[in-house]
Amino acid sequence: MYFINILTLLIPILIAMAFLTLVERKILGYMQLRKGPNIVGPYGILQPFADAMKLFMKEPMRPLTTSMSLFIIAPTLSLTLALSLWIPLPMPHPLINLNLGMLFILATSSLSVYSILWSGWASNSKYSLFGALRAVAQTISYEVTMAIILLSVLLMSGSFSLQMLITTQEHIWLLIPAWPMAMMWYISTLAETNRAPFDLTEGESELVSGFNVEYAAGPFALFFMAEYTNIILMNALTSIVFLGPLYHINYPELYSTSFMTETLLLSTTFLWIRASYPRFRYDQLMHLLWKNFLPLTLAFCMWYISLPIFLAGIPPYT
């Protein structure tokens, strides 16, 4: 029974991830005044499945100088972590109801750094290694602000549980009292998932393709799947943290509908940003975080700690 529960969670996520690639290509196409994929199936709707078949049927290339075990483990670990992040997410009922759900998501997302670093090192190519080092520095840096923003938000809800966050937002979205945090959080999620304008790891002009330059066929597809799964997850998390979906104990479908709509809109904004903005320079990327976001988030964190103390208030805690 538990295995069926896991499948009913993972299969829709993988299907959503497949269609997100199609939506991205369609949006980029229409924003560049062209059609995008429209050959495979009606309106190109079967394109993701054709891509998956092509990638997994190709022979996986392995350069002679690579470290074989790490070369294969890295993409597998990447996708495994991306899928395991969904475990504590309420939809409206999580797979495992963790009291420290938010901490689990933070800790597991930090582990994805290892898969990037291993893939860059195991490829035994200087371009891969440079791409991996950039990705690791960027991911670790932006995780600092994400953790502080989450801490500030959790001070308002009073619990690390994601269910509690939704209960807190029954009357008002946390987006309204904490909108500067929400803006910084959204930009940090863009950087965390290595998306434009922060896709420095894939700088085509200088790094060919980044840490996955030596990968082809199946292992490359695993990295690709992990990236898009993470995009959906980050937007789902943004939806829960700042735009608490409607929750009524007797109407679970109401929650699912509002949750899906918010996640879809946020994901579309990700793609819209990709089509609109040029890439940042690497030093600007780091300045934005360490000189702008970090002092601001620390100041907000102090504010959210001191406010309930001054007003002798306590957060809603169950």
UniProtKB/Swiss-Prot annotation:
Residue intervals passing through the bilayer: 3-23, 70-90, 100-120, 146-166, 171-191, 231-251, 254-273, 294-314
Cellular component GO terms, alphabetical: dendrite; mitochondrial inner membrane; mitochondrial membrane; neuronal cell body; respiratory chain complex I
Key words of the record: Electron transport, Membrane, Mitochondrion, Mitochondrion inner membrane, NAD, Respiratory chain, Translocase, Transmembrane, Transmembrane helix, Transport, Ubiquinone
GO molecular function: NADH dehydrogenase (ubiquinone) activity
PROSITE patterns: COMPLEX1_ND1_1, COMPLEX1_ND1_2
Function: Core subunit of the mitochondrial membrane respiratory chain NADH dehydrogenase (Complex I) which catalyzes electron transfer from NADH through the respiratory chain, using ubiquinone as an electron acceptor. Essential for the catalytic activity and assembly of complex I.
Entry keyword annotation includes Disulfide bond: no
The protein's Enzyme Commission number: 7.1.1.2
The name this protein goes by in its record: NADH-ubiquinone oxidoreductase chain 1
Sections of the chain in a coiled coil: none
GO-annotated biological processes: aerobic respiration; mitochondrial electron transport, NADH to ubiquinone; mitochondrial respiratory chain complex I assembly; response to hydroperoxide; response to hypoxia; response to xenobiotic stimulus
